[in-house]
């Protein structure tokens, strides 16, 4: 089995940066992703994907990305 996903979309809000109790940096963010096809009415639907970033990438995205920035995310899916 293989669990890998790549998303490209717009940053909806500024990432929320914090630390775990063990001192590991993490950030949460929402990515707005357009579907690659149109529905029956000819409209592209949009999904809002909650993402969690860890360690140095959490710092980088929090420092460098603004609301509305197009960014790419590569990771895995996990149910919570």
Predicted regions and their residues:
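Single-stranded nucleic acid-binding surfaces, predominantly the OB-fold ssDNA-binding core
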Residues: 1-80
């Amino acid at each position: 089995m293989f669990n890998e996903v790549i998303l490209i979309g717009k940053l909806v809000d500024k990432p929320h940066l914090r630390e775990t109790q063990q001192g590991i940096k993490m950030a949460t963010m929402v990515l707005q992703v357009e579907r690659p096809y149109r529905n029956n009415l000819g409209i592209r639907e949009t999904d809002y994907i909650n993402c969690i970033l860890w360690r140095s990438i959490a710092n980088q995205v929090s420092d460098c990305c603004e609301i509305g920035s197009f960014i790419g995310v590569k990771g895995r899916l996990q149910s919570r």
